[in-house]
């Protein structure tokens, strides 16, 4: 029954690892429960209502992933996408948050249509195999950078853009301890090393004043202030088209990048680098975004933190089911879950980033025609703070280098350019030129 419902294979998987994987994924992405209300409330949305809708939309989308796609990936309102929603569409362009929610709804409906027609899968297949292999290490660097930043180990600098943080602060010291502890547990091959590291680091943070414990149970705030709040009279404006297309580009290629990267790490791809049941995963993403807009939150997407659950042993829909259950529990135990500091989850993000670098061995950097675009893809993800920008620039550079060097065919035919790859590059160039 478990195999039919969730794709659980008892010959290669264990319930313990699936549950640990799901809990680990939740703990590494639980920060969104604090961050999303903070960002979206800047638009005038009710922060308490946003907290509740963040949980509910994550539950619904992740359950679709568990039952329909049967994959160990979890979803929630996406970082970056929520910032674009609040700080660009509302605070910069001057539109209401209801206008932004309408754009998210339209994007979700378009995604459902693209998924049903199979067009999203064709877009994935248009990305050359070698670039798909570069996505995983690029994401690894990106989430490691996010972990270092959230821990305070690195910080912004006007002189050098980024520099070391205060290595004497309790938070940074706690994070470095968590990294060393978790790394040691991983070296010893302790099952659930990431989860154990997070929990121990959180507990040690209490006397240091880093872990802020403020209670256990609270009643979930009502979603009424933001539920089904749309603004229809502006849907045919040029700005609405631009906003919808921007949401589409960012969400599509963040999701594609995350699915390919995490699936490569989990060994859930075929010889041609194609992700298992990717179309079903796309549907979970599309449904999550559509339902999220109805509830009152920004675009829902697959979380790169799913890699932490995969590395903890999660391989089936049971992992994402566990994460969904954790989000339900979080509705009732918000103060308890929100007590986990970013310094505790930083170790998981950084070490998962290390693990995801494994795929880089499949990229031949001595072949400059493919090596340079892969380098561009990998390095731009952390430097632009965007998975999608890394993929887009990687594809553009791949096509241009092939064209200018006259190398239209690769020694591996799976890396050959075709009309779809060239069309993608043209669309990406237009995206940067006009959006």
Where are these regions (language model features)?
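Helix-loop-helix junctions within the multi-pass membrane cores of secondary transporters/permeases
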Residues: 2-36, 57, 78-87, 91-136, ...
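Loop-to-helix transition at the N-terminal end of transmembrane alpha-helices
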Residues: 43-63
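Juxtamembrane transmembrane-helix boundary signature
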Residues: 59-79, 110
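Helix-loop-helix hairpins and the membrane-proximal interhelical loops
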Residues: 1-49, 163-164, 195-279, 429-430, ...
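Membrane-embedded alpha-helical modules
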Residues: 93-207, 211, 321-435
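Hydrophobic alpha-helical transmembrane bundles of multi-pass membrane proteins
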Residues: 24-25, 33, 49-54, 135-139, ...
């Amino acid at each position: 029954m478990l195999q039919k419902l969730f794709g659980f294979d008892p010959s290669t998987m264990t319930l313990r690892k699936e549950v640990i994987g799901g809990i680990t994924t939740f703990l590494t992405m639980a920060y969104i429960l604090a961050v999303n209300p903070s960002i979206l409330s800047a638009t005038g949305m009710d922060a308490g209502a946003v907290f509740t809708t963040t949980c509910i939309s994550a539950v619904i989308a992740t359950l679709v992933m568990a039952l329909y796609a049967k994959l160990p990936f979890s979803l929630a309102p996406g970082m970056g996408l929520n910032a674009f929603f609040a700080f660009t569409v509302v605070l910069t362009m001057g539109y209401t948050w209801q206008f932004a929610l309408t754009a998210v709804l339209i994007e979700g409906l378009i995604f459902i249509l693209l998924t049903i027609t199979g067009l999203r899968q064709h877009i994935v297949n248009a990305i050359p195999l070698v670039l798909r292999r570069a996505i995983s290490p690029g994401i690894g660097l990106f989430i490691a950078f996010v972990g270092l930043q959230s821990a305070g180990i690195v910080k912004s600098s006007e002189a050098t853009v980024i520099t070391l943080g205060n290595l004497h602060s309790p938070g940074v010291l706690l994070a470095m301890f968590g990294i060393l502890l978790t790394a040691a547990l991983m070296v010893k091959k302790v099952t659930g090393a990431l989860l154990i590291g997070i929990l121990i680091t959180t507990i040690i943070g209490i006397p240091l004043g880093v872990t802020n414990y403020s209670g256990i149970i609270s009643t979930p705030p009502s979603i009424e202030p933001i539920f089904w709040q749309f603004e229809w009279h502006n849907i045919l404006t040029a700005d609405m088209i631009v906003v919808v297309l921007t949401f589409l580009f960012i969400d599509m290629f963040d999701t594609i990048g995350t699915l390919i990267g995490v699936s490569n790490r989990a060994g859930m791809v075929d010889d041609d680098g194609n992700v298992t049941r990717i179309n079903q995963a796309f549907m979970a993403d599309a449904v999550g975004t559509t339902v999220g807009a109805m509830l009152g939150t920004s675009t829902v997407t697959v979380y790169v933190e799913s890699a932490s659950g995969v590395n903890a042993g999660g391989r089936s829909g049971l992992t994402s089911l566990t994460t969904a259950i954790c989000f339900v529990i979080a509705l009732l135990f918000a103060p308890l879950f929100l007590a986990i500091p970013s310094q505790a989850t930083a170790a998981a993000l950084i070490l998962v980033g290390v693990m995801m670098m494994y795929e880089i061995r499949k990229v031949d950097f001595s072949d400059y025609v493919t090596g340079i675009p892969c380098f561009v893809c990998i390095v731009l993800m952390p430097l632009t703070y965007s998975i999608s920008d890394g993929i887009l620039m990687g594809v553009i550079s791949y096509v241009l280098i092939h064209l200018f060097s006259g190398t239209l065919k690769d020694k591996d035919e799976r890396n050959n350019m075709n009309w779809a790859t060239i069309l993608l590059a043209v669309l990406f160039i237009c995206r940067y030129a006009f959006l």
